[in-house]
Amino acid sequence: KFVVEGEEEVGSGHFDDYVAHHADDLAADVCVWEGGSKNEQEHFTVTGGVKGILAFDLSVRTADVDLHSSLGAYVDNAAWRLIDALHSLRTPERRLAVDGYYDLVEPMSAGTRAAVDRMDFDAGGLRERAGLRQPFLRDDPKLASVSEPSLTVNGFESGYTGDGVKTVIPREAHAKLDCRLAQGQTPQACFDLIRAQLDRNGFSDVEMTFQLGEDPFRSNLDDPYF
């Protein structure tokens, strides 16, 4: 049996309904998701799981209009306000500073950890190809790539970014973010934890809008089919 699905890049919004309506036709002992990808060593890869994702927006408004920067000594700035909110969610060690966030992560089994240890992983090659200018965030990037949650700022927009100079205090700021979720975490639970943390940190004025969520999945690497 083959299933071809073309909405993966936009969240597979119709896939669950399709599977539910065709459950009898799709019944099977095991499913293989064929990707055909190769790693840096030109080896075909077998993926035993994927992280989940939570995508959301943050927005803040500090005034009804942009103001002249001569008022900057005493008038707050939406860009700084959102930067401060983002900074409050990260520790100096570059981990998420969100109460309860890591408590949801399920421990890795011995079999899965052994499989990770056997993985081909070329961290140096990635550094060279991407031209990375900062150290890796973790001493073991291979393990982090499969087991550790992350929070990524995808984009930030505020104020004037055109040519030349425009001395304004922006009235609003917006950021797009995503979290890669480890096994045991769910998009809604993590969204709620981040919202609660922002409120505790004094940023209840920062609006948070859910965009997309998918649960993580990990195959049982001890299963005979694997």
What is the predicted role of each segment?
Residues V50-L54:
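Short, flexible loop/turn motifs enriched in small residues
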Residues K1-G49:
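Acidic/histidine-rich catalytic neighborhood of metal-dependent amide-processing enzymes
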